[in-house]
C-alpha cells in the first residue's frame, strides 16, 4: 500500500522482501547509534515484519514505512508514524541509510508524512524524540516546524539486545499553530 509519493520518493508499507535491504542500511553503526537496531537474526526480523504488517498497519492504519527511491527502486530509509503511550499526538520517526543522508530526503519524506497524517488521519499533533547528540535530526525537526518541549526518558533496546533507558529531547508539532 502506497502512502505518498514525492518528487524523489515513494513512501509505502514495508514488505517482507524489503528486509534484506534494511540490513544493508542498518549495517553502518552510525545508523543505529541513535535508534534501535534490527534483530541480529534475519529470520526473527522477517517474523517481526510479518506480524507488524498484520497487526500494526491493520489496527492503526499507519506505522513505520519504507522510503523507496523512485529512480532506482532501492530502499533508502524508513519513516512513519507510531502511537507512543503517554504522549500527545503521534510520534514521527525517521532513518536514512548513510549514502542518502544530507540530501534532503528526510525533509522530503517527513513533510509528506505530516501532510498525510493531517489530511488522511485527521491528526493535528505530533512528537519526535531526539538524542541531544543527533544534530542532524534536531535540525530536521526544527526545519519541519517542531519545537523542543522537554527532556524525557524512554526505554529501548541496545544492539546486544539488552534493555536500556535513554534520555531524549521531546519535540512537538501542532498543525493548528502553523500558517497555511
Task: Give the label of every model feature segment.
Residues 53-54, 157:
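Short beta-turn/strand-loop junction motif enriched in small, turn-promoting residues
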Residues 30-53, 62-63:
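Conserved GNAT-fold acetyl-CoA-binding loop/helix
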Residues 1-33, 66-180:
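Acyl-donor (CoA/ACP) binding surface of acyl/acetyltransferases
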Residues 57-59:
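Soluble sensory domains of the PAS superfamily and closely related sensory modules
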Residues 54-55, 92:
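Short, well-ordered strand-loop elements centered on a beta-strand within folded domains, enriched
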